[in-house]
Structures are given as structure tokens and as C-alpha cells.
Amino acid sequence: MNIDNSAALHAPMASVLEMILGALPLPEGPLLDVGCGAGHKTALLRSTLNVAGSLVGIDCDREALSAAARGGMWAIAGDAHMLPLRTACCGAAVCLATLGMLHDQRTALRELRRVVRPGGWLVVVTATTAWTFWSVRLRDWIQALLAERERRRVDLLLTTPEPAADLATLIQDAGWREVRAGAFVIETADEMSRRVLPLISQNSARQQLTPARLREYDALVADADVELLPLMLAATGR
């Protein structure tokens, strides 16, 4: 991958990722970025988490690592399936747009559990496609619900809707606890413009609604078509 263009992979998720990271405690120790590439996420990670200490990046692409090191990251060549780090040496870890490229995701997630100290957290973001209910009216309705629930927006984003269930299970099986996951439809207005719109599990949406709004929501869901859509999945574990 051209390292000059790889930042575009992360751009659609930037606002959601910032919200998720902002709701997590500051890491008590170095922050690990597995699959760091050229370090395009460094500024976001430092500003959102106020990471004044070590930011450790691991990648197998040495050219990209050179660019990451110039950006202030401690860049290490390594394999996500066998991290070249001591047990419990990191305060937290992120794995962004990387998990889907690994041939043994369970092993990689167990390695992340090994190197993150007890009490630390993990954030995973990956891409997939899935058949799911969707409509323009349902999209706009969900956006309005999120705007109404500004203070609890992260709670609504990570409700583990069905497309995110397998990712949540995968992370739990690797030894992580308190796992929460969300799914986000990637909408492309044109070649240069993308945005992500959250899918909210029906149970979680129903718990937020008055009887009148619940009837409106049920009608929208019943009217929605099943489509094969590109999704971004995001999950956290402790």
C-alpha cells in the first residue's frame, strides 16, 4: 500500500474513533498501536488520549515504520501474531484497520491481551460487508436519535448489533472482558467523501423510546430493505 494514501483508510472513522477513545480512561503505561503503518493516527491518538508518554507502533512494513518514527512514535518491526514485547508492558492497545489482514486473528488478540497490563483496554476497528436492514429514512432517524442522546452517544454507538456480534465474541474468546462493539455503515457520496453512520441494535434503540417513537421506529424497520453493505466494526475490551 502506498503510505501516502493509507491515511484515507482511517479518515471515515476518525470522528467515531475520537468519541470512543475519549470515553476511555487514560492508559497507565505506553500505548501500543499494532499495524501502525506510517503513523497517520499518531496525532489523533496523542490529542484524544493526551498521551505524553511512549506511543509504541508495531508493523511489518519497514518503509512505513521509518515514517512513523519520524512522527515521534517508537516504531518496532514485528509480527502481530508474536509481539516482540514483554508481558503486561503496555497500558492499552489499538488495532485499527489491521485485524482483517491477519491470518490468525485469535492469536493476535491473545497477544494483545498478553502485553496489555491488567486493567488496560483494547480498541479494535476493522472493515467487513454484511447483509443488514437499511433505508434512508432509518438512517436519518438514527442520526436524530444520536443527536438527542448527546451525553450517552458512546453507549448507543457500542450496542453490539448483529453484524458486530462475531467480532465481540472473537475478542472475548481471546481473554478480554467488558467487550462492547458497534457497526457503522460506510456511505460514499463521491470518490473523495465518505461518512460512517451507526447501526444501533433494535433492543438498545427500543429502550430509549417513548411508545409513540417506538411505533415509528418499528414501522421504519419493517419498511427497510436488506442490503449488502460495507461496514466498519469497532469494539472495546478491558
Name each model-derived stretch.
Residues 165, 178-238:
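Conserved Class I S-adenosyl-L-methionine
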Residues 11-28, 44:
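Conserved alpha-helix/loop element of class I SAM-dependent methyltransferases that forms part
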Residues 32, 38-82:
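Class I SAM-dependent methyltransferase SAM/SAH-binding core
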Residues 81-93:
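A short acidic, Gly/Pro-enriched loop at the edge of an enzyme's catalytic core
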Residues 91-104:
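A short SAM/SAH-binding and catalytic strip from SAM-dependent methyltransferases
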Residues 1-14:
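Class I SAM-dependent methyltransferase Rossmann-like catalytic core
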Residues 106-118:
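A short glycine-rich, Lys/Arg-flanked "PGG" loop and its adjoining helix->strand segment in the class I
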Residues 123-187:
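Conserved catalytic/acceptor-binding region of the Class I
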